[in-house]
Amino acid sequence: MAIYTDIAAELYPPQKGEVPRGVRVHTATASGIGLVRVDIEREGLRRAKGRYITLDMPRFSTIDDKNEAYVWAVASQLRSVLPKEGLVLVAGIGNRAVTADALGPETADKGFVTRHLCEGAEAQDLRMRPVAAFAPGVEATTGLATAELLQSLAARLKPAAVLCVDSLCTASSRRLGASVQISTAGLTPNNAPALTRQSLGTQVVALGVPTVMEMDSGARALVVTPKDIDAIIRRAASLLSLAVNKALQPAFSVGELSFLTS
């Protein structure tokens, strides 16, 4: 049985050498953070065309979620793939009632939302970019599909980009709660319509942390999550929200953003 993964760096691991035509892999390490960048340049491969950036760091349950080195590492990679101007809609994807799936909503809750402050002539003096945040919930509890809700919001708000934050699946136990993936290819939530430029009509960037892993027990497939998942989600959501806020509001320091969203 093939073990599923959302992490592109696990599909095209740099240590294996050869990759298919149309795939480029780059690796780097700085300040104890490993980076694997996978560029998929054509369709028909194991992942959609786009850039996938994986940052490997210590387990979220053990780190300071306001550590500026980690915040900067994620923020700088986000800035490299997000448009430089215009409204960004942060969408917290997932079910907040299920701990391992609550990363998206928890991150959106901590977002520094500014759209309501950036509509007057004084907006230039505020040094702020317009940002909105939304956690659509899950269809089983709302009766509304995430794609439907985001399509409506995107049509109304016309954002420069939608940033979707979600929990991911990994095939590597060492990456559970210890990696971040950023993708320009959008997001396909579990058994739900894809959230992409084609479906939402604007650029879609996905941001996530692997919180679950499939295992084949022989008799049946299992999905497992770390025993410290509560701490992982709490600190990962805090760090990711700071990184998103820093990427979108570079004029503010990490300390200022932490104060403004506390």
Question: Where on the chain are the PLM-derived regions?
Answer:
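N-terminal amphipathic/basic leader segments beginning at the initiator methionine
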Residues: 1-50
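An N-terminal, well-structured beta->alpha segment
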Residues: 41-81
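Short glycine-rich or small-residue beta-strand-to-loop segments that form or flank ligand, phosphate
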Residues: 56-58, 87-98, 133-137
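Gly/Ser/Thr-rich loops at beta-strand to alpha-helix junctions
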Residues: 93-101, 140, 167-171
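Glycine-rich phosphate/diphosphate-binding loop of Rossmann-like nucleotide-binding domains
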Residues: 95-129, 133
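A structural-propensity feature for long, helix-poor, extended segments
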Residues: 126-154, 158
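Glycine-rich phosphate-binding loop
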Residues: 147-194
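C-terminal functional extensions of proteins
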Residues: 200-262
